[in-house]
From Swiss-Prot:
Full protein name: Lissencephaly-1 homolog A
Native source species: Salmo salar
Protein family (similarity comment): Belongs to the WD repeat LIS1/nudF family.
Annotated Gene3D superfamilies: 1.20.960.30, YVTN repeat-like/Quinoprotein amine dehydrogenase
GO terms assigned for molecular function: dynein complex binding; protein heterodimerization activity
A Gene Ontology biological process term: reelin-mediated signaling pathway
Main location: cytoplasm
SUPFAM superfamilies named among the record's database cross-references: Lissencephaly-1 protein (Lis-1, PAF-AH alpha) N-terminal domain, WD40 repeat-like
GO cellular component: 1-alkyl-2-acetylglycerophosphocholine esterase complex; centrosome; cytoplasm; microtubule; microtubule associated complex
Record Pfam families: LisH_PAC1, WD40
Length: 410
C-alpha cells in the first residue's frame, strides 16, 4: 500500500515524536536527519502520542473485525440451515437463533432465575440484588420491580394461572406475591438457612421449598403454614420441582444425589446417584417428549403401561443425565459443557434438550442421537438460568453478567 506524501510526512512526525518522548535521542536525531524533518514545536503537539493511539485503535478494530466475521459466519450458517425455509419449519423444531432479540439491563447483581409468565407476554427475573423484576419480552420494556426480600432472591415460580408468584431468598423466607396487584401477600418462615428453591404445586394449593438446611418443606398457600417436611438429603438441597400432576417431587443436592419423593406419604421413592459432583438443577420431561425418549433409549420402563416419568439433572461434573424414575436408572449422559451445568429443560416439542452453564453458553441437544447440535455464546459470564415459553417462540436466559436475554426461536 502506497502512502501519499502528506500521510508519509504525518507518519514520520509521529515516529519522531515517539522516539523523542521515549528517550531514544540518538535514533531520534538520526531519523530526523534521514527523514529530512523540520521539527516545529507547535506543529509537533499535534503528533504527541499519535503512534500509540493508532496502534491501539488498530488492535481494537482488529478485534471488532474478528467479532463481526464470526457473527457473519453464524448468519451464513443460519441461512444454509434453512433461512427462507425457516417459515416452513415445524414449531416443534424451533430453536433459539443468535443474536439475542434483547439484552436487558437493570439488575445490580447476578441474575439467579428467569421464568416466563404462563399467560401474559411478560417474564420475571430474580437476582442477588434482592429484587424481582418484571419485563415485557415482546417489546423488551422493563415494567416494574418487586421489593421485599432482604438478601439474594434464589428462585421464583408462578402458579398455573399466573395470578400468584412465589419467591425464596437467602434471607431464609418464602414470599407469595399477588401478581395482579404486585403486592406481597404472605411471608413464610421455617427454614433455618438460605432457601435455594421454590415451586408452586400444579394444583395451586401448596408450595414446595428447598434449603441449605438440608430439608424440603411443603406450605399451604391459603394459610402459609408448613404442612410437611421431607428429610433425607445429607447436604444443601439446591432445587425442588414437582412433576406434572403433583404426585411426585424431585430434588437435587450438594450430596451429589437426586431424590424423588411421593408427596402423599413423604417417602423417598428413588435415590439417583451417578453424578460425581454437586447436582445444581433438575427438570421433569413433559409427556410430549416420552415417545422420543423411548425411541432414544429403548427404555424398558413399563412397556405395557404409561412410560416414565423421566427426569433430567445437571451437575457441576459438567454433565446432564436423563433418568427413568420408575426403575431408578440413568438412561443417558450428555457430555459437552466445559463448566458447571446450571439449567436445562426439554424443548416443548419434545425432540431437544436446552441447557445453560458456567461455560457462558446455551446449548441445544439432539438427545436422540446424544449430540450437541448447536452452541450459542449466550453471555459475557456464567449463564445461571433459562426458560422456554410454552406457546410463543422465545427463550430467556439470565447471567452473572447481570443481564437477561431474550432469544427468538425459528
Amino acid at each position: 500500500m502506497v502512502l501519499s506524501q502528506r500521510q508519509r510526512d504525518e507518519l514520520n512526525r509521529a515516529i519522531a515524536d515517539y522516539l523523542r518522548s521515549n528517550g531514544y535521542e540518538e535514533a531520534y536525531s538520526t531519523f530526523k536527519k534521514e527523514a529530512e524533518l523540520d521539527m516545529n514545536e507547535e506543529l509537533d503537539k499535534k503528533y504527541a502520542g499519535l503512534l500509540e493511539k493508532k496502534w491501539t485503535s488498530v488492535i481494537r478494530l482488529q478485534k471488532k473485525v474478528m467479532e463481526l466475521e464470526s457473527k457473519l459466519n453464524e448468519a451464513k450458517e443460519e441461512i444454509t440451515l434453512g433461512g427462507p425455509i425457516a417459515q416452513k419449519r415445524d414449531p416443534k423444531e424451533w430453536i433459539p437463533r443468535p443474536p439475542e432479540k434483547y439484552a436487558l439491563s437493570g439488575h445490580r447483581s447476578p441474575v439467579t432465575r428467569v421464568i416466563f409468565h404462563p399467560v401474559f407476554s411478560v417474564m420475571v427475573s430474580a437476582s442477588e440484588d434482592a429484587t424481582i423484576k418484571v419485563w415485557d419480552y415482546e417489546t423488551g420494556d422493563f415494567e416494574r420491580t418487586l421489593k421485599g426480600h432482604t438478601d439474594s432472591v434464589q428462585d421464583i415460580s408462578f402458579d398455573h394461572t399466573g395470578k400468584l408468584l412465589a419467591s425464596c431468598s437467602a434471607d431464609m423466607t418464602i414470599k407469595l406475591w399477588d401478581f395482579q396487584g404486585f403486592e406481597c401477600i404472605r411471608t413464610m418462615h421455617g427454614h433455618d438457612h438460605n432457601v435455594s428453591s421454590v415451586a408452586i404445586m400444579p394444583n395451586g394449593d401448596h408450595i414446595v421449598s428447598a434449603s441449605r438446611d438440608k430439608t424440603i418443606k411443603m406450605w399451604e398457600v391459603a394459610t402459609g403454614y408448613c404442612v410437611k417436611t421431607f428429610t433425607g438429603h445429607r447436604e444443601w438441597v439446591r432445587m425442588v420441582r414437582p412433576n406434572q400432576d403433583g404426585t411426585l417431587i424431585a430434588s437435587c443436592s450438594n450430596d451429589q444425589t437426586v431424590r424423588v419423593w411421593v408427596v402423599a406419604s413423604k417417602e423417598c421413592k428413588a435415590e439417583l446417584r451417578e453424578h460425581e459432583h454437586v447436582v445444581e438443577c433438575i427438570s421433569w420431561a413433559p409427556e410430549s417428549a416420552h415417545p422420543t425418549i423411548l425411541e432414544a433409549t429403548g427404555s424398558e420402563s413399563k412397556k405395557s403401561g404409561k412410560p416414565g416419568p423421566f427426569l433430567l439433572s445437571g451437575s457441576r461434573d459438567k454433565t446432564i443425565k436423563m433418568w427413568d424414575v420408575s426403575i431408578g436408572m440413568c438412561l443417558m449422559t450428555l457430555v459437552g459443557h466445559d463448566n458447571w451445568v446450571r439449567g436445562m429443560l426439554v424443548h416443548p416439542g419434545g425432540k431437544f434438550i436446552l441447557s445453560c452453564a458456567d461455560d457462558k453458553t446455551l446449548r441445544i441437544w439432539d438427545y436422540k442421537n446424544k449430540r450437541c447440535m448447536k452452541t450459542l455464546g449466550a453471555h459475557e459470564h456464567f449463564v445461571t438460568s433459562l426458560d422456554f415459553h410454552k406457546n410463543a417462540p422465545y427463550v430467556v436466559t439470565g447471567s452473572v453478567d447481570q443481564t437477561v436475554k431474550v432469544w427468538e426461536c425459528r
